[in-house]
Amino acid sequence: MPSVRLASTAGRVVDLAEIAERPAVLFLYPRTGEPGKAAGPEWDAIPGARGCTPQSCGFRDLHREFVALGVTVFGVSTQKTGYQSEFVERNHVPFELLSDRDLALTRSLRLPTFEYPVERGGPTTLIRRMAWYVEDGRIEKIWYPVFPPDRNAQMVLEWLGARGRVLPEVRSA
C-alpha cells in the first residue's frame, strides 16, 4: 500500500501505508448525493455510478461486525472533506471517510475513474466503486466491480468468514 496521506472526517490526516499494517477495509465510491438534490439522468446513465449512499450505509449498518473482527473500516471518495463530514453526520456513519480530492491515491495506484460534469467549472474526476481488504501493508483482496452496492459490506464479511475469521452473526440487510 502506498504511503498516501488523505484528509479524514475525523479532522486528521491518515497515511494509508500505516492503516494497511492492521486489518482494514477501504470501500471506494464515486460520490454521495446532496440532500434534496436529484442526481439527474446523466448520473443514471453512468454504469455503476448509483449506489454510493446504500454502499456507505451498508458498511455503517454492519460496522459492529467489522469491529468485532478487529477490522477497521474507511470510506474513500474524491469529494471534499467538508461535504463528507456533512454526510457522516446526516447518516450517523461511525467510521472515517477519507478525501482523495487531489487524486494522490487515484494516481498512485492508477485507479479506474470517470469524469462527471459539475454545475460550476469543468468535469470532476470520480473513483469507480470498489472495496479492498488490506493487511500486513498490502491489498489482499479487491472487489471490483461492486454490485449490488448495498450488499458490499455483507460480501466482505462473508469473504472474511471464508478466510477463517470468526464471523459474528450477521443481520440481513
Language model: regions and residue ranges:
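Chalcogenol-based redox active-site neighborhoods
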Residues: 1-173
